[in-house]
């Protein structure tokens, strides 16, 4: 009976749908954690209620269990197992021994790919360790990722409609799929995967409105993204009131959207001269978009720290050199931002300017240790985490 319960429980967890409609893998950390807990609980129950079998069944090694679970959530754990042994199905043995053997195989199953466990996104809840994160964490991380690699687009559709959408495109690998799936879980959208890229797209108006509200709470920091956001907010509001006017303004100004003065113009323009659009309350509702190219030094530190994780996923590099002169750098074409980060981390190195890109690179052991401590506390979530672990092992 207990074996049937266990099989049903495992089947339920294995096929429990995640937010993207796919299924959770049996070997991700949370599922692994749940299975071990229930197996351990049932095993102890049987041992306590089958005293005749007590001498034939040793309790689970709790210290081994705890250390393994710490390893499953520990960002420093290594993949050290390659065998492909499966859970044994033993016949002619009592239920307690069956449960013990199943649990023992899971506890000692060296065939579980630890690298996969350490780099898989749990379904729903998170065990202690690298993946301990929640809704606000991923919202802040999303803004950093969007600042570094996102895009806000407006497209004309069938000559009489405008389409609005936000996009993040990352290299196609398991870790980047995981991070975008988590963003989808908290912020909606869709995931498209091809041979080279995994792409998160959101294009329905309701969720775009929610993201605009999110950017009010956790503001974009790069100048270009601020101006892209200002353009979509302006055109979208006008589009709701007068479709033809919005299309005309979009076609006229789409190549001028990075000009901060454009949004003052949208506020001050006499709309009665364009398509005879003059609702009495338009100017009251459309207060204009204020663009501040300077970066607010009063940002919440926790926000900036988590934002930086998202930013580094696309604009950071952990460099390993043969001469052991390793370094960490981040870059962008936004001088205001790079100087803000330079001051934020109190880095004295000079900026490098090359091909219209500002680069801040650190070699000194002092700065290397600062960033190791930082990324140990604030954990990277995508493929950059894999690069960081390799880099960290060489530098400690």
Curated annotation (Swiss-Prot):
It holds the Pfam family LAGLIDADG_1. SUPFAM superfamilies: Homing endonucleases. It is found in: Mitochondrion. Keywords: Endonuclease, Hydrolase, Intron homing, Mitochondrion, Nuclease. It comes from the Eukaryota. Residues 74-90 have a biased composition (Low complexity). GO terms for cellular component: mitochondrion. Mitochondrial DNA endonuclease involved in intron homing. This is Probable intron-encoded endonuclease aI3. It comes from Kluyveromyces lactis (strain ATCC 8585 / CBS 2359 / DSM 70799 / NBRC 1267 / NRRL Y-1140 / WM37) (Yeast). The gene is aI3.
